[in-house]
Swiss-Prot record:
Protein name: UPF0102 protein HI_1656
Molecular-function annotations in GO: nucleic acid binding
Entry-linked Pfam families: UPF0102
Top-rank taxon, per record: Bacteria
NCBIfam families the record matches: PRK12497.1-3, YraN family protein
Family (UniProt): Belongs to the UPF0102 family.
SUPFAM superfamilies for the chain: Restriction endonuclease-like
Organism: Haemophilus influenzae (strain ATCC 51907 / DSM 11121 / KW20 / Rd)
InterPro entries named in the record: Restrct_endonuc-II-like, tRNA_endonuc-like_dom_sf, UPF0102_YraN-like
């Protein structure tokens, strides 16, 4: 059985997927796990593969959802994306891709989309 935190995370990831689909992106995959980390969502935006990190913070005692994506998390995100691309016979060097952040506040309606978060 999923923990409450995992259930909440899955709910926010689902809301992020619906939000991005409403903006025209097409779902490819979710929850792709690698030793170095997880890719929450992988979407397609026209000819671009979009690796989406979904973050949520119910209060700011430990910083905002955006602030929680520190250098270490960014490196894990890049490494996981490169491993996923390798499974598709691609790499970060030759694939048209970007890294977007979906940050939630307390509720699924409190959503912020930051395309090209890693630039």
């Amino acid at each position: 059985m999923f923990s409450l935190k995992r259930q909440q995370g899955a709910s926010f990831e689902h809301q992020a997927r619906l939000f991005l689909e409403s903006k025209g992106l097409i779902f490819i995959a979710a929850n792709q796990n690698f030793k170095c980390g997880e890719l929450d969502l992988i979407m397609n935006d026209k000819e671009t593969i979009v690796f989406v990190e979904v973050r949520q913070r119910s209060h700011s005692a430990y910083g905002s959802a955006i602030e929680s994506v520190d250098w270490r998390k960014q490196q894990k995100w890049l490494d996981a994306a490169n491993l996923w691309l390798a499974k598709q016979n691609m790499s970060l060097e030759d694939a048209n891709c970007r890294f977007d952040l979906i940050a939630f506040g307390k509720t699924p309606q409190d959503i912020q989309w930051i395309p090209n978060f890693l630039d």
